[in-house]
Amino acid sequence: MDPLIAPLAFLLAIALGCAVGSFLNVVAYRLPEGLSLVHPPSRCPHCGHRLGPKENVPVVGWLWLRGKCRWCQTAISPRYPLVEAATGFLFALTCWRFGWQWQTFGYWILISFLISLTLIDWDTMTLPNSLTKPGLVLGLLFHLLLGWQRGHWIVPLVEAIASAVLGLWLFDLIRMGGSLLLGREGMGDGDPKLASMVGAWLGWPSLLLTTFIACFIGSIYGGLKLLLGTLQRRQGFPFGPFLAIGALISLFWGEKLITSYLNFVTPQF
């Protein structure tokens, strides 16, 4: 990319990501409640005042309001601008990692699904089918288009389907094993579907890496919560956010991590 154009391209990616992040905040709040995603327009969750154009600008609107509703002065959660900024950062990181090609737009879709599912799971301990199923289908379609571009569409599609099935079966086994060990539901039924979606998008090697990272980070989180006394031994916590973190790490650095691991465990002669 031309050095003069690159900064503008990254700024465009950040701006687009922040705008998408603003919509993802709406999805995370309204979808679990069964509300429309487009009507009514954004408003203060406390007093119901409709936000104006300036107040709706991602990140900047929250800063301009100093984190409070202009009418009722109730504090507005900083999560809103943080989600917007994080989405903008991830969109720019995708451009930096993969360049400006059509696959980048596909990965933006994956990132959007992962963020919205993370927020919903964190809030409600659920991963709605209305997001995991379309995310799975779009992942398969992504690999269908990728294969068509390369002249052999059937192979990437079959690999994506196999990876999706592996994700579903793997996490169903983990779920059943956890239930046997704990004597209760060890994992929600949405986690296998999210794993299936990740497999469809990233393939089985990255799915396995995602699983390892998610279990590792999730174990640390759960252990710390137990030590601090903020989590009971038989109390569950959302696992979807850790799957999403693992998927993002696999998306950006999975190939290098897998190669480094194979070089480490493979004998050198």
Curated annotation (Swiss-Prot):
Residues spanning the signal sequence: none
Any one GO cellular component localisation term in the record: plasma membrane
Bound cofactor: record note: Zinc is required for the N-terminal methylation of the mature pilin, but not for signal peptide cleavage.
Subcellular location: Cell inner membrane
GO molecular function: aspartic-type endopeptidase activity; metal ion binding; methyltransferase activity
Protein residues bound to Zn(2+): 44, 47, 69, 72
InterPro entries: Peptidase_A24A_bac (IPR014032), Prepilin_IV_endopep_pep (IPR000045), Prepilin_pept_A24_N (IPR010627), Prepilin_peptidase/N-MTase (IPR050882)
Membrane topology: Multi-pass membrane protein
Residue intervals passing through the bilayer: 4-24, 100-120, 127-147, 154-174, 197-217, 238-258
Keywords per UniProt: Cell inner membrane, Cell membrane, Hydrolase, Membrane, Metal-binding, Methyltransferase, Multifunctional enzyme, Protease, S-adenosyl-L-methionine, Transferase, Transmembrane, Transmembrane helix, Zinc
Catalysed conversion reaction: Typically cleaves a -Gly-|-Phe- bond to release an N-terminal, basic peptide of 5-8 residues from type IV prepilin, and then N-methylates the new N-terminal amino group, the methyl donor being S-adenosyl-L-methionine
Domain of life: Bacteria
Cofactor(s) needed: Zn(2+)
EC assignment: 3.4.23.43, 2.1.1.-
GO biological process, one term: methylation
Annotated function: Plays a role in type II pseudopili formation by proteolytically removing the leader sequence from substrate proteins and subsequently monomethylating the alpha-amino group of the newly exposed N-terminal phenylalanine. Substrates include proteins required for biogenesis of the type II general secretory apparatus.
Family the UniProt entry places it in: Belongs to the peptidase A24 family.
Protein name (Swiss-Prot/TrEMBL): Prepilin leader peptidase/N-methyltransferase
